[in-house]
Amino acid sequence: GLLKAVDRAFELGAETMQLFCSSPQGWAFKAMSQTEMSEFRKKATSFDIGPIFLHGIYLVNLGTSNQANLRKGIESLGHYMRAASNMGASGVIFHAGSHNNTSYEVVFRQTVNALKEVLADAPKDVWLIIENGAGMRNQIGSTFRELGGLVKATGDSRLKICLDTQHCFAAGYNIAHEETIAEVMTEFDQEIGLENLVAVHANDSKQPLACRVDRHENLGEGYIGLDGFLTIMKHPAFQTIPFLLEVPGFKGGGPDN
């Protein structure tokens, strides 16, 4: 439950957290009671945990050619945006999806329209946050140029970006070395704007640079390495950005000490 998630974050010594508020593998969504959401906010505040982020379900795909599933994805993001507002969360992080060999111009326009629709119906106090992709085939938003295009075309200051370090590395952006991270983050700023970076998924990579596969590893046990994460954390772009772990865990049960 939600309250147990806060307890778990506190036990780990976390200062920020990310959670689902429904099964990430299904469309079903049950709205939480006002009492439950109020208790969540109070407990998170008492433990001084924040900012808090929700992660959208994995079925959301704004690039799909299946219009019924596109509609379900838009509705799911709407549910999560309202829940985030009621829970005191900063926003909803989600994967934009992929397309099936469709013209990117068509997919781009569909994705922008979907983003605009979600934001038009959403509370004004929460962000809709696109997570960068790992560069897998036909994935939307694996390059800074694509992400920047979506942000600019949507034209809403509530649309933000979460940078997943493993996805970034897998897509060919070398953030693990001082000689290259400056160039990478300069490109991010030029294409997207550093003001639109609001969260980092801090994950090491099971596969090497530009592998174009989504494979997370514990920090220091992958190709980015501990020195790589020290490089990332020292860079000015990340000084005030919350870091969220999505790693297997040393015991295989998710983030741990």
Residue ranges and their predicted role:
Residues 9, 55, 73, 84, ...:
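Conserved, mostly hydrophobic/aromatic
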Residues 29, 33-36, 66-69, 73, ...:
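Residue-level preference for long, well-ordered alpha-helices that form the structural scaffold
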